[in-house]
């Protein structure tokens, strides 16, 4: 009879100890969770700050930086490729998207107003004459022009024409390819190299150059050679296309040989930045 109260008191004490222990565990868990949330918030803020910093740096670096501060050779080449390759890659990606869209619409019977407008815009930008009649779309000409210039080929030509981004024309005009301005369209802004096209950014320079190769009558044979590769289901590469670029330089084949040799010498370095 005496044992029963003792057992009851013992049970009560055990329950109290259990409650106290549980409260401490919950308190610690809450503190840990709060600490984790605080850590995540700080990490998130750091990520936002990094993105903002990247955005600011991207805006600042829209023009070609002064690459002469890098030692000549590999360090300067790497700095140049880090600067120009994103724009070349982006340009070719945009072209590929438009080309794929054209291919997907090639056998389409009915066109929506939005599709007509898009086709009209592409034809205009690539200087392809089109009456607007969807039954008479110049597909061969469109697909011959709306195509990539091999990324490594563009990078090699930019490096060759600009001295890896150190020429006065590249630094002052953002002109990486030695593109001359048309008569009556040249602007003689202070500090710019006269007689040559001036661009507001590296991106604009790359876009103008690629568009020039894809539209100018002088490079018709280059585009036809590229179209033949497509027809044969072969890859459009720098190795295949550099020697197909005729009429680009007054030096003729010797320039193509020089360009190809430069590409071969820097092929691995360029590939590492693609």
Curated annotation (Swiss-Prot):
Residues 32-64 have a biased composition (Polar residues). Keywords: ATP-binding, Nucleotide-binding. SMART domains: LYZ2. The keyword Nucleotide-binding applies. Residues 32-74 are annotated as: Disordered. The keyword NAD does not apply. GO terms for molecular function: amidase activity; ATP binding. ATP binds at residues 247-254. Pfam families: Glucosaminidase. Coiled coil: none annotated. It comes from the Bacteria. This is Protein bax. It comes from Escherichia coli (strain K12).
